[in-house]
């Protein structure tokens, strides 16, 4: 297989290598014969190589010979008609067909001429193949059809031609995705229009994740597609019904609004609210103003939560988004109805947008929420205060969670000035000093002592049986991570 050539469309290199292993090229000596009848011989391979290079003079010369075989193939299965479809040569597709070329031939990867023409938007070639009777429902290894490929590429005329030829509108590839999903995710509104007019299934959802074409469009920020689907009657407040959560699957109850927010498509999110989306919907476990905290400052770990923060699309900054959402009815003090303290994690139930902003020591967001009317003293259902959250209560991944030492110190100062008690104890027997120890931030320990935290209030065991000293010496969820500087800071703080 010629890996120095452009690899076959739609096939990632990993797949190509895998298939190369599954279908090894046969090597034969000059005195041997191959059992593959149509495999091009050394003597006749020249014209087929010309077709690969889009030079059809050699093909024309070869066609004059009585021995010409229009279905000769290269080791990977590529034939002249496949190259004609790839290079958008409809006249050669017609000539080769007249010479006996199989229009439904496929490579070892089950790539047909029509799928090639559809994927590359080669309209004249695709229409020629359809007119000559090519199978419009051919499938690649992943069961991708020409309609899906054309929908993703965006040529609405090819999509229309395939529909008129009787293609199955709602055929599904191996992951359960349809042509409408591919068009919606790619933002090809013209293809979406044609598919909708033809009567495709708008409500089809993937079995595990519950994703629909509507949700794909929201996740990818495809505003034009969103508007077309709304005009078609999609419910702006519909949510996914997840059968198998975790990993890369979304949370159950995610709406298009939440997909847009968490993917960084903030202009689209505002547009959805203006079109009727509920700015206080928390069926996914969180509301838009809660989610903006991790859109601005990513979570932790080598997992989906630890992915880089999304790139904000459009011209709407995250803080301007918050302001507009509040103007459109978002409750700045909305308290979460779901959640629990899993292990040592912070309990989100009862948390407000300000509470989550404090958790990440996001000073700018905290200041804006205060300006918009946030109550800085609202605790979660465990009575964990914003001060405790900023200090580090709930931190399990040292050095990976949002908030630098400098940011945390500023947040602690702000929160105490706003009325948060540095000596408060929550229902899990946690204090702000326990949080500072969990972060391994000696600066936060000293700052809390400076702000009035006294050892009589914090030098005790939490629900897990750990004092701040125990935590600083390494007792914490996961691996042991002692911090001698934090231990020293706690010793200093205990003598205040």
Model-found features: residue ranges?
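Ankyrin repeat boundary/linker residues
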Residues: 74, 107, 140, 173, ...
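Bacterial N-terminal signal peptides
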Residues: 13-24
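Start-of-repeat signature of ankyrin repeats
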Residues: 43, 77, 110, 143, ...
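Ankyrin repeat domain, specifically the short helix-to-loop turn at the C-terminus of the second helix
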Residues: 63-68, 94-102, 127-135, 160-168, ...
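Ankyrin-repeat junction/capping positions
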Residues: 71, 104, 137, 170, ...
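Ankyrin-repeat-protein effector appendages
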Residues: 32-47, 198, 232, 275, ...
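Ankyrin repeat A-helix N-terminal signature
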Residues: 49-54, 83-89, 116-122, 149-155, ...
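Conserved ankyrin/ankyrin-like repeat signature
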Residues: 58, 91-92, 124-125, 157-158, ...
